[in-house]
Design a protein with these regions (language model features):
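Acidic low-complexity intrinsically disordered regions
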Residues: 1-122, 126-127
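Beta-strand/loop nucleic-acid-binding surfaces
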Residues: 126-141
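Flexible glycine-rich surface loops and low-complexity tracts that mediate binding to linear polymers
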Residues: 144-158
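Loop/turn positions that initiate beta-strands
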Residues: 145-147, 219, 364
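P-loop NTP-binding catalytic core
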Residues: 154-224
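Conserved glycine(s) of the Walker
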Residues: 231
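Hydrophobic positions on the alpha1 helix immediately C-terminal to the Walker A/P-loop
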Residues: 235, 239
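P-loop NTPase catalytic core
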Residues: 240-243, 252-478
Length: 478
């Protein structure tokens, strides 16, 4: 009995930290970091070794209710960790009257911790960004890629960023209307039913070629299979300019990943849509971030009934970047491709869809082949069956300077009958039957020749199947 009493009176050898001690441990580096910033010391922490003195200072610890005692720190600086240069606006009500704010706007990027930033440049962080508190994100139902307009205030004391005080509009919509928008993943996908017409008054044979051989509909998921030097960049620019000219209701996004800087500049000067790029001299993580920015912005627009087109160059390089950044799965395919690396690009490409009752997301991506890389071939095989439109460029035709170097037999669109009127569809099918009897070079040259001799596809299709007694018999394709 005495032994048990003695053991009960003896303190245990193990020590369990109490709440105050844990609080002290968390605040040590934070206090020193704040002191560094306050002293504007460029050489690091001058307060090393003073942590014990700070902890023993009277009145340092907090009361249970969270209010500081005499000598304690204010709410803004207490327990903020690496966010102590942000600001806490959680107590600001949505209907608070703002009298001295600044009008601002930006694209929202939400962090894993729940807070976010309005980016002036969607793909780059800068000191001009605007901090958005977690309470604002929850109150207004904000999502990644939202275009936010509102009132902000300048940073105070040690704060680094401007702070969002009030949200005036979300994607140019009233706040209450925006709260009712559906979630992209809950929208019902259907086959494309409305064609994106690429033919223009200018003599661009390639655009008329695509309209008849592999039409693109709103909500299409298309792949341009491109060997080196086959003209894919020129083709993408022409597609982009045709979309902006013929369909002003469509929001165009050109996404360039791992491309040459001069090609990025040329695309920005040639295309009227939004060009989002990450050149080859950027880190793979930046490539992935740029792709996320583009797809999230597109989803937000589709949710409110908009038609969006993303032209991606290329899904092959996007997959390469994913292979370098993904957590290794322990398995490796031929060419060094991790099977887990393909999931994120597939999720991007699979987002293309036509939405029932309005809105669509069209993605046309280039896939590189015949590069000499086994990984590129594996990536193409992974995406080959996922698209519902394929346009194959032929290296042999490009080497013979035949443009557009399109392989007619290997190109086409699934359910293209939904994209043509009945009368036009019959002519298109008849055209395909004629071209199917010819070789790759002969069929392409014949179609190019007939297109160049007619002012429009409508006039050209009138020639298809013309009777031998007609005046156009010698020129018909019957």
């Amino acid at each position: 009995g005495n032994e048990s009493d003695a053991s009960a009176a003896t303190p245990s050898a193990s020590y369990s930290a109490g709440p105050d001690d844990l609080n002290d441990r968390r605040e040590r580096p934070q206090r020193d970091d704040r002191r560094d910033r306050r002293n504007n010391n460029p050489n690091g922490n001058v307060n090393i070794g003073q942590g014990r003195e700070q902890r023993e200072r009277p009145g340092h610890r907090m009361r249970p209710g969270g209010a500081p005692t005499a000598g304690g720190r204010d709410k803004q600086q207490r327990g903020r960790g690496n966010r102590d240069h942000y600001m806490d606006l959680s107590d600001l009500e949505a209907d608070t009257e703002i009298t001295d704010g600044i009008d601002a706007e930006g694209m929202l990027e939400i962090h894993a911790d729940g807070f976010g930033f309005l980016r002036k440049k969607p793909t780059l962080a800068s000191s001009d960004d605007i901090y958005v508190s977690q309470s604002h994100v929850k109150r207004y139902g904000l999502r990644n890629g939202d275009l936010i307009k509102g009132i902000v205030r300048a940073p105070k004391d040690t704060e680094k960023y401007h702070g969002l005080l009030r949200v005036d509009s979300i994607n140019d919509l009233n706040i209450e209307v925006s709260k009712l928008r559906p979630n992209f993943d809950e929208l019902t996908p259907i086959y494309p039913e409305s064609r994106i017409r690429l033919e223009r008054e200018t003599k661009q044979v390639a655009m008329r070629f695509i309209d008849m051989i592999a039409p693109i509909g709103k909500g299409q998921r298309g792949i341009i299979v491109a060997p080196p030097k086959a003209g894919k960049t020129i083709l993408l620019k022409q597609i982009a300019n045709s979309i902006t000219a013929n369909h002003p209701e469509i929001t165009l996004i050109v996404l360039l990943i791992d491309e040459r800087p001069e090609e990025v500049t040329d695309m920005r000067r040639s295309v009227k849509g939004d060009v989002i790029a990450s050149p080859f001299d950027e880190q793979p993580e930046q490539h992935m971030k740029v792709a996320d920015v583009a797809i999230e912005r597109a989803k937000r627009l589709v949710e409110i009934g908009k038609d969006v087109v993303i032209l991606l160059d290329s899904i092959t390089r996007y997959s390469r970047a994913s292979n370098l950044t993904v957590t290794p799965s322990g398995r490796t395919l031929q060419g060094g491709l991790d099977p887990a690396a393909i999931y994120r690009p597939k999720r991007f490409f699979g987002a293309a869809r036509n939405i029932e009752h309005g809105g669509s997301l069209t993605i046309v991506a280039t896939a590189l082949v015949e590069t000499g890389s086994r990984m590129d071939d594996i990536i193409f095989e992974e995406f080959k069956g996922t698209g519902n439109m394929e346009l194959k460029l032929d290296r042999g035709l490009s080497e013979q300077r035949i443009y557009p170097a399109i392989d007619i037999k290997a190109s086409g669109t699934r359910h293209d009958e939904l994209l043509y009127p009945d009368a036009e569809l019959k002519k298109i099918w008849q055209l395909h039957r004629v071209l199917a009897n010819l070789g790759t070079k002969e069929s392409t040259e014949l179609l190019i020749d007939r297109i160049e001799k007619t002012p429009s596809n409508k006039d050209f299709l009138l020639m298809v199947g013309a009777k031998p007694t007609d005046a156009t018999a010698s020129k018909s394709m019957d």
